[in-house]
Amino acid sequence: MWVAERVVGERRMREIQRFARNAKLTVVCLLLTVVVLRGTVGAGKFGTPQQDLIELRHRFISHPHRALAEHHDALSRGGGSSSSSGRAAQRDDEPDPPPRTLRDPPYTLGPKISDWDEQRAAWHRRHPETPPFVNDVKPRVLLVTGSSPKPCENPVGDHYLLKSIKNKMDYCRVHGLEIFYNMALLDAEMAGFWAKLPLLRALLLAHPEIEFLWWMDSDAMFSDMAFELPWERYGPYNLIMHGWDEMVYDDKNWIGLNTGSFLLRNCQWSLDFLDTWAPMGPKGPVRIEAGKVLTKYLKDRPVFEADDQSAMVYILATEREKWGDKVYLENGYYLHGYWGILVDRYEEMLENYHPGLGDHRWPLVTHFVGCKPCGKFGDYPVERCLKQMERAFNFGDNQILQMYGFTHKSLGSRKVKRIRNETSNPLDVKDELGLLHPAFKAMKTTST
């Protein structure tokens, strides 16, 4: 030591010793910091088995859908511990059968039924407690909608599907309608536009008590909660759609009607019409070739595979004598209302008009055609679609909330505000829109 002191000097040696002591202290503090952080924050992929177990448990509890997806992937790769579970997963993932070719027999929805009116009448004689009409003019109605069995490709799409079904449930509750939500593809051949046809036929046959099915697309919402359909107008008709006679029968325009919201009576005529409508629907060569026929025949139709709406126009225009007398193309109110011409006018409607009109002044339905909130790609910017869908939902929701004394702060806000003070005599509060106990609500009739 004294040799070192003589070489570097006594003062310099003391500085070196002080630095060494400080370095030791720094290393000790660093080790203590690592130990503390490892025990509290977590060691990540270099952690202890106990900490790793905690992190795994948190991960799978917080993200159960991810755990299920990983489990499903493992089974599909043959990694499942149970051979029966593996076989079940493989069966579920089996590819669809080859598409129908042009040489195959035409597609059918099921066995031909020719006496449905007689079968249904006999059923009603056996079950008088469920008549097809709830009063002299109002039929028993089942509103039908649905979505894909798979999650939306756009994560926010599932949230807007929830808003859409909530909106429909509100309207059905106020108007005494039943509702059916479908998430099953009943026939793989009829995917896409055409998936509704097998479902409608199945519901007609399973529910003879229902007089009308009301199909509504998942991207359509009720905007007028007070509007009751003019049922007395539809006595002689079996199919009611939004459209114009001159555009369908004279111009043969492919947008002369809309199949996103329509009514179909439960009768033999409807089964026959579905049988005529369906053969253009099977995916593959049949749908592609049918699309060429529709594009050639219908005015302004772009080139793409056959869709249910174009096929409807084609059938009515080419076979008007057979079907036209039982089809009512409604344009007195918005059974379907194109969102692009409605959503920017909501504030004007609120200022100048009131619910219960159903037409351009206060539309019954706002239909977001082309938005595809559940998919990754639509015909319009996704930000605009989602913003306007939020406004449309709140526009209808305000009519429900007002019954309970609330409203959204604005059409673009999820937050609500109180619009009247609470009272000790709540039954004396006036129901301004008449939606709490509407006279048009379907009441269950009793047989005498």
Curated annotation (Swiss-Prot):
Lumenal side: 43-448
Subcellular location: Golgi apparatus membrane
Region (Disordered): 71-113
Main subcellular location of this protein, as a coarse class: Golgi
Annotated signal peptide: none
Catalyzed reaction equations: Transfers an alpha-D-xylosyl residue from UDP-D-xylose to a glucose residue in xyloglucan, forming an alpha-(1->6)-D-xylosyl-D-glucose linkage
InterPro entries for this protein: Glyco_trans_34, Nucleotide-diphossugar_trans
Transmembrane helix listed as a keyword: yes
Phenotype reported upon loss of the gene: Root hair phenotype, characterized by short root hairs with bubble-like extrusions at the tip.
A single GO cellular-component term on record: Golgi membrane
GO biological process: root hair elongation; xyloglucan biosynthetic process
Tissue localization of expression: Expressed in root tips, leaves, inflorescences and panicles.
GO molecular function: hexosyltransferase activity; UDP-xylosyltransferase activity; xyloglucan 6-xylosyltransferase activity
Keywords attached to this entry: Glycoprotein, Glycosyltransferase, Golgi apparatus, Membrane, Signal-anchor, Transferase, Transmembrane, Transmembrane helix
Enzyme category, top tier: transferase
Cytoplasmic side: 1-19
Protein name: Probable xyloglucan 6-xylosyltransferase 1
Designated gene of the protein: XXT1
